[in-house]
Regions:
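A glycine-/small-polar-enriched, mobile loop at the entrance of the PLP active site in fold-type I
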Residues: 2-57, 61
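Conserved PLP-enzyme active-site core in the AAT-like
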Residues: 6, 10, 38, 55, ...
Length: 203
């Protein structure tokens, strides 16, 4: 077996690969419903949330788009310190949002004080944060950044991309007051791609 040394897709356990060879379960059956609901309940523990966890047929980038399209009408502050946070900013622009950037040098974190200063200058409906910027390997201090938003601009929603961190590091979604958090299956979960997951407390 050839091993992949990438952030994702990552190596999938042979037992999981074998399970994919089994016949599919029709999605309208009681068996599927029981399995799907059971998966959601388990994911709530991973997300550390009491809210619903959605399992949509989309990519992580698709869930970035879902976040900005559904949770902000106009004004978004995008924190940018790498390729994937840059992508989320561009997704917001492409979806007709008035997105402003809070930039940090690639390889550096988004500083809580810088976020506080930006939030004091303008009222934003949402702020986008990539928890672990996959392109550089930098983990942003999400707990501290969320605390800044709650203190300085409590009506601003916190949207988090945790594609390469959820399941690999502790994220206390409810306790930290994160409003929307997304991840994908092909990184820390070590599953096949194309199974994004997200938790929404505001729809």
């Amino acid at each position: 077996m050839t091993h992949m040394f990438t952030p994702g897709p990552v190596d999938v356990d042979p037992e999981v690969l074998e399970a994919q060879a089994k016949p599919m379960i029709p999605h309208r059956t009681a068996e599927f419903n029981e399995f799907f609901r059971g998966t959601e309940a388990k994911l709530q523990k991973v997300f550390m949330t009491e809210n619903r966890v959605f399992q949509p047929p989309a990519t992580g980038s698709g869930m970035q788009e879902a976040g900005v399209r559904n949770l902000a009408q106009k004004d978004i502050l995008s924190t940018v310190n790498g390729a994937f946070s840059q992508r989320w900013y561009q997704v917001a622009i492409d979806n007709g949002k008035q997105a402003d950037r809070l930039d940090a040098t690639w390889g550096d974190i988004i500083e809580p004080d810088a976020l506080a200063d930006a939030l004091k200058k303008k009222n934003y409906e949402a702020v986008t944060i990539v928890h672990n910027e996959t392109s550089t390997g930098v983990e942003n201090p999400l707990k501290e950044l969320a605390a800044v938003v709650h203190e300085v601009s409590p009506d601003t929603l916190i949207l988090v991309d945790a594609v390469s961190s959820l399941g690999g590091t502790k994220i206390e979604t409810d306790a930290w007051g994160v409003d929307f958090i997304l991840t994908s299956s092909q990184k820390c979960f070590a599953m096949p791609p194309a199974c994004p997951l997200d938790r929404k407390s505001v729809v």
